[in-house]
Amino acid sequence: MQAPPTREGPRINDMIDEPTVLLIDAEGEKRGVIPTDEAIRMAEEAGLDLVEVSPNAKPPVCKLLDYGKFKYQAQKKANEARKKQKTVEVKEIKMRPNIDTHDYEVKMRAMLRFFEEGDKVKVTLRFRGREMAHQELGMVLLNKVKEEVEPIAKVELYPRLEGRQMIMVLAPK
């Protein structure tokens, strides 16, 4: 013997097993506490469904509405909410300590675009060979980046050395 499948969502029409319900009609007016079978009859006469909107209340609150339309609206609302959610990505900008001015400007434009999109930016400064002896140049460059983006971004992870590279993470304000 298998249990009947459980339905998602509110109980409707004959699934409501309470003797009385607090009825709200299609216009949103309170009709008061009435027997469930009378509420179902009223719903059928109006060509609507009796939908339980607040099952935990005593007596449960039920509303007269078109269940198909109600379900569609709820689905639409959920989809809109899902679209508005944006996962914050961490974009990476790679530089060298002796970066040329034009290259630096191009990297900064890309960084500003990432901030406008709401993404975090990881600035990676890579040292090669003897450049490791001049880490202060890297710190100067990262401080310059930090000062330029100060109005629109905040430092989430201050510059630190990891192996042969210096890393700083910035997040939009």
UniProtKB/Swiss-Prot annotation:
PROSITE patterns: IF3
InterPro entries xrefs: T_IF-3_C_sf, T_IF-3_N_sf, Translation_initiation_fac3_CS, Translation_initiation_fac_3, Translation_initiation_fac_3_C, Translation_initiation_fac_3_N
Coarse class of the protein's main subcellular location: cytoplasm
Cellular compartment(s): Cytoplasm
Alphabetical list of Pfam families matching this protein: IF3_C, IF3_N
SUPFAM superfamilies per UniProt: Translation initiation factor IF3, C-terminal domain, Translation initiation factor IF3, N-terminal domain
Keyword terms, alphabetized: Cytoplasm, Initiation factor, Protein biosynthesis
Cystine pairings recorded for this chain: none
Gene Ontology annotations for the cellular component aspect, listed alphabetically: cytosol; membrane
Example of a GO biological process term: ribosome disassembly
Function per UniProt: IF-3 binds to the 30S ribosomal subunit and shifts the equilibrium between 70S ribosomes and their 50S and 30S subunits in favor of the free subunits, thus enhancing the availability of 30S subunits on which protein synthesis initiation begins.
PANTHER family membership: TRANSLATION INITIATION FACTOR IF-3 (PTHR10938), TRANSLATION INITIATION FACTOR IF-3, MITOCHONDRIAL (PTHR10938:SF0)
Family: Belongs to the IF-3 family.
Annotated protein name in UniProt: Translation initiation factor IF-3
Classification lineage: Bacteria, Pseudomonadati, Pseudomonadota, Alphaproteobacteria, Hyphomicrobiales
Record gene name: infC
